[in-house]
A protein has these predicted regions:
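Surface-exposed, charge/polar-rich loops and edge strands
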Residues: 1-247
């Protein structure tokens, strides 16, 4: 299978740089017996009593920070995941990749590059990395959104059902961004149950596929946790002949 098999034209003017005022006003493409174009709030029409809605309760870290090299060159650091002993696995974007041992300078602290793993660096902080990212980090908007992050993104680049204590993802589970509290309450009133899993979205989600043969692509891994209770709910729903909606 070739990556070129999936090429298509996507006009830039069709890429929204800002969310709509109401989450559930986004467009919805439905493909069942035929293709239908709907508003996302119409997803309510496809639920029935006894169905199950499974969502990802991950929450997004303000995972992008900006500093500079000792030589003065600008550096962008994007968190992949926090490691032990105040270390973190990160992506680093700069004019030239830093060497092992290089120091990156920020307003109130420095970090040191101590190792490299493929496209990622292991860096050493002088305090817990999450403290740093929560203090000076920016919302990690995806690269196809051509604007800096703003205050509104702290709310809108997150789901309404996230577990904010988790702080485990560096990108939002975007399929869930279109649900608001009103829509979720309407779904529950039908008699639909809701289950939560935890999938931590990593920075690798922004990595392009650089090979022509898809089988040669080394895809990144992500942490996923599904409780026994959720497994039981999914199995029971299927055995009852009802639908499972995985978001």
């Amino acid at each position: 299978m070739k990556t070129s098999d999936f090429n298509y034209e996507l006009p830039e003017e069709l890429i929204a740089n800002y969310p709509l005022e109401k989450r559930n006003s986004s467009r919805l493409l439905v493909h069942l017996d035929e293709i239908e174009h709907k508003s996302f709030k119409d997803v309510l029409d496809y639920f029935e009593e006894g169905d199950l809605l499974v969502v990802n309760n991950t929450s997004v870290i303000p995972a992008r920070i900006y500093g500079h090299k000792e030589s003065g060159g600008s550096v962008e650091v994007m968190l992949e995941r926090v490691l032990e002993n105040n270390k973190a696995l990160v992506q680093i974007r700069s004019g030239r990749a830093p060497r092992i041992g290089a120091v990156i300078i920020f307003d109130t602290f420095k970090l040191k590059c101590i190792d490299r793993q493929d496209n990622f660096f292991i860096v050493q902080f002088d305090r817990p990395p999450l403290e740093v990212f929560n203090e000076i980090g920016h919302v990690p908007l995806p690269p196809y959104i051509k604007r800096p992050d703003e205050d509104l993104d702290k709310d809108r680049y997150a789901t309404v059902y996230e577990d904010r204590e988790l702080q485990d993802s560096v990108a939002a589970p975007t399929a869930g961004l279109h649900f608001d509290d009103d829509l979720l309450n309407a779904i529950k009133k039908i008699g639909v149950k809701m289950a939560r899993v935890n999938l931590s979205v990593g920075a690798g989600t922004f990595q392009p596929v650089k090979v022509e043969n898809i089988e040669e692509h080394d895809i990144h891994s992500e942490y996923l946790e599904v409780s026994a209770d959720v497994v039981d709910m999914v199995n029971a729903t299927k055995e009852a002949g009802k639908k499972v909606f995985a978001v």
